[in-house]
Amino acid sequence: MSELKSEQGGMKKERVRKNALLLFSKPPIPGLVKTRLTVLKDGVFQPEVASGLYHCMLFDVVEICCAAMADLERESAERAQAALAAGEEVVRDEYEMIISTTPAKNVEVMRKLFSDAGEWPRELVFLCDEGASFDEHYNQAFEKTWARGADCILSMGADMPALTKADVRAGFNALHKLDGVAGGGIVLAPDQEMGVSVIGWTRETDFDHSGVFYNQEGLTVLPAYIDKARKQGFPALYLPPIPDVDTMADLMHNITLVEALNYCAQYDDVTPPWRTAQALKEMGWDEVRVPPNDLHDPREEIDK
């Protein structure tokens, strides 16, 4: 803590709260990412096309996160000034953007990928996560982020082109609600397939990812986190759902969201996923049309 002089002349303590956004991502290498969108599995695209699309999603998500963190830092500075003027405790939030990848050789691959793209709004930190399972990879990435001094971690994947600044802000604001709670707690946002798209907790929370992925009792990821929190007695704060892209059906849904976000950005404070939108347009997949169907409830007594 540092000391600041308030307008009333007294010395007030300033606490710096360090927040980390931990983004998990592999390099956009053909055959390594988004394979369910490709002919290698149950998709329709060549691996080079799917990896190129993911490349755009990754950059869009990082840009959106950076924009959200800039907003959060500005708001924190304004609150700190108001608290100082009122002679109240000052909490100043700092944010760090961390990208975790695997294996270790891909750290430099990712660093070069972003460096070659030009200047980014803030420093990007690159880490390597290792382990024999998703659980172990995620646990190690969290451990490395705590070791960097983080007080709160909000983690997510990069295959979410419909992510908004509001989603990121909501995640950190929820974490801050838990900051003073004895024992801590978790925050999570569901995806569209019984999993989570965002998960995080505070430093004080004795929690990890063990047993969540490929749960031995058959639970999917969202109920596995809830079950784990319930058994350990931790509060959990629910964030708005954020869809990701794994399958062709996921992609269809996200195509409509990307189009809407890019249009709405003209009229609202939205950082649009413009790279993803451009890639979809170049692929000829920038709009979705569906054939009519009669799989609906009876309407004979309604439509007359």
At which residue positions do the language-model features occur?
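Conserved alpha/beta core of the MobA/IspD/sugar-nucleotide pyrophosphorylase nucleotidyltransferase superfamily
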Residues: 220-304
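Conserved donor-nucleotide/metal-binding helix-loop-beta segment in metal-dependent transferases, i.e.
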Residues: 163-193
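Short beta-strand-to-loop acidic/aromatic patch adjacent to the donor-nucleotide binding site
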Residues: 150-159
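Short, glycine-/small-residue-rich phosphate/pyrophosphate-handling segment
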Residues: 206-226
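Active-site-proximal specificity loops/subdomain of glycosyltransferases
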Residues: 80, 105-141
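A short, N-terminal amphipathic alpha-helix
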Residues: 53-75, 85-90
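Short acidic/His/Gly/Ser-rich catalytic and metal-binding motifs that mark active-site loops
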Residues: 29-37, 107-110, 197-198
